[in-house]
Amino acid sequence: CTLCHQIADVPELGTDAGESGHYTIETFADPFDRPAYGPYTNPRINPMRINAVFTPSHSAHVTDSALCATCHNLKTPVLNAGGELTADKFPEQMVYAEWENSAFADGGAEASSCQQCHMARAEGPVKISNRPRNLGTRDNFARHGFYGGNTLILDILDKNRAELEVGDGDFAAAMEATRATLQSAAALVIEETVVEEPAPGERELVVRLRVENNSGHKVPTSYPSRRAYIHLAAADQDGTMLFESGRLATDANGKPTGAIVGVDADTGAGFETHHGEITSEGQVQVYEAIMEDISGNQTYTLLNAARYSKDNRLLPRGFPRDPQTDPVVGKWSDIAMVGEAELDADFVAGSDRVTYRIPLDAATTSVTVTADFNYQTMAYG
């Protein structure tokens, strides 16, 4: 708690100089002068000074997204082929920069801070401390859940809750809230299904769908192991599967392995390119960032990463599509799309459209199409 609440409101906050953990904590001669910043005016000072040796102090910067940039714009060292440090930095995650270039940034059409989305407000006025007993209530209290899209660590902790002396439902409640946040991050819409004749005597079902990003940053964002993908299935009038893209692989016991059938990265054959059109089950639309080392080789080891060879993560609404014509905040190279997505006219700020073409035989009289948008914290392998 005290680390974030000690970060000072300095000019570097939210800039290149203040990112990657380069925060400022003020010095003090008297321990009782050590400030702990919060959003409320006129805080009761003595209880915290006496019990924790911090002086609660009002400062609005703790409600500003720039505070989050301290850790959520993160660049890591780049090594040369000999394992030596270079002058370059790799943009491991640029969540704040993505937000700065979205409609959710300050002054944007949908302005909303990181804290407004990731720190749900308590209902009604609350007492933010049980001491002293005559403490008044405060409105608009931000609950410190920090819910995002990942339950991996929460699940590990939950499995060890007895050793951690944590109650049965605590981690479960956090995981439920996290999954609810993840559900709201994006949406998938089937826009059109139509039968076409690409050639005389041939029929195909054309499915056009759209994936929407409802977040103030890319989806997925942060650490590059994360990926999202489209699973689309089409069955005929008898329930026979005609086509399936994005199916999870299973082991001999029918248990999902985490690999996705048809995804090149999951077979060691490079990585799955971005698709504007999908015509076979061996093609899957995967939204992800793929790292490469200084020699251009694909890598999943962060400290080997020098740049991205693919970044088609869904863009937030308001994001600049063309840096030559659209205004960009900061360095375009830190947040740019990379690979085939750059050339896809349907890959735009806030959404992506994908077309599926499914061959039909003469015996097929009706088709049921289902599609869902899935997320993995850790890519297979």
Please place each PLM-identified region on the residue numbering.
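Primarily the internal scaffold of c-type cytochrome electron-transfer domains
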Residues: 2-362, 369-381
